[in-house]
């Protein structure tokens, strides 16, 4: 990927910038096609604000969602370890692991996630232990821009450096004594730089694996000026192909959540059509007060089943957008 620098040292923690909202975060996921299950974990250090963001979300084989969201105190950006969540680099550019041990909320009805106050007061909790080990099945993608004019994936007000990679994902999960394992496929990313979630006007991020040699990571992002960018990669026969065009059509629920996706993607080598069905959705949010105004984003995290030609795949669909007058600004696109 031209225009970016990426070194083994970037796998580890960077010196925190002077920005008050400097963030450095790591994320992993993995999903098993056969049982339609899996999950993701994220740890974001916001050392200049004195806390981390820890997020764990598992889509269980029986249809429930197990999750936890915290902001544990931290004093520096020297390690990825906070609130029972930890991350380690086993081999740069090849192998990483992420572990969680602590209480987790178990939800029969994910609609409770729409009301965080009620969620944290009433959701049943149980001890959990979750271990992810991930090994690369793709090249690395991304890095830190080499010039001040180089366009970054999400924009420089959401992260300066960013890289990602499709992975083989093995997990051992213990939720309240109910144990399961999977050996499947997933994805990881690592970002650093200034970040507020509400800096995103709206985007649609589509990540999925279709076996060890085929995958996608696609982003459609629109800024407050109405400018839209489409970027990302298809993995085909193990190689990444940068996309040149992308069309996305979303069918919605009555609650204005994404339900069914139709996708057309073109690279220099091929044009493909895909369809995706969101099997379960975690409806999350982020809020930030600026002066007298409360900014709020909806963050929809959907476990998604995809079809690409004769292959089925699994992954995560993430729709982020600002709410204006309680309405998502990107709807119905």
Give, region by region, the residue ranges found by the protein language model:
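Structured soluble/peripheral alpha/beta segments that form catalytic or ligand/cofactor-binding pockets
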Residues: 1-333
């Amino acid at each position: 990927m031209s225009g970016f620098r990426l070194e083994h040292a970037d796998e580890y923690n960077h010196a925190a910038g002077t920005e008050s909202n400097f963030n450095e975060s790591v994320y992993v996921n993995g999903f098993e096609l056969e049982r339609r299950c899996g999950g993701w974990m994220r740890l974001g250090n916001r050392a200049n604000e004195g806390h981390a963001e820890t997020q764990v979300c598992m889509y269980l084989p029986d249809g429930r969602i197990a999750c936890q969201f915290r902001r544990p105190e931290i004093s520096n950006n020297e390690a990825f370890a906070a609130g029972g969540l930890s991350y380690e680099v086993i081999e740069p550019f090849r192998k990483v692991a992420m572990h969680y041990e602590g209480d987790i909320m178990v939800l029969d009805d994910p609609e409770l996630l729409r009301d965080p106050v009620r969620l944290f007061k009433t959701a049943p909790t149980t001890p959990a232990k979750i271990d992810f080990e991930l090994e690369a099945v793709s090249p690395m993608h991304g890095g830190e821009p080499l010039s001040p004019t180089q366009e970054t994936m999400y924009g420089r007000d959401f992260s300066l450096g960013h890289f990602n990679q499709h992975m083989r994902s093995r997990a051992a999960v213990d939720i309240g004594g109910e144990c399961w394992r999977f050996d499947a496929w997933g994805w990881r990313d690592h970002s650093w730089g200034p970040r507020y979630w509400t800096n995103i006007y709206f985007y649609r991020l589509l990540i999925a694996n279709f076996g060890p040699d085929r995958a996608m990571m696609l982003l459609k992002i629109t800024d407050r000026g109405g400018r839209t960018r489409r970027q990302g990669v298809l993995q085909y026969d193990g190689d990444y192909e940068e996309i040149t065009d992308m069309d996305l059509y979303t069918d919605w629920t009555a609650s204005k959540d994404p339900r069914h996706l139709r996708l057309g993607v073109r690279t220099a080598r091929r044009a493909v059509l895909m369809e995706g069905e969101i099997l379960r959705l975690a409806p999350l949010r982020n809020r930030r007060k600026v002066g007298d105004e409360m900014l709020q984003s909806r963050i929809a995290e959907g476990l998604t089943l995809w079809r690409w030609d004769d292959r089925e795949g699994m992954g995560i669909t993430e729709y982020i957008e600002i709410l204006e007058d309680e309405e998502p600004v990107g709807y119905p696109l």
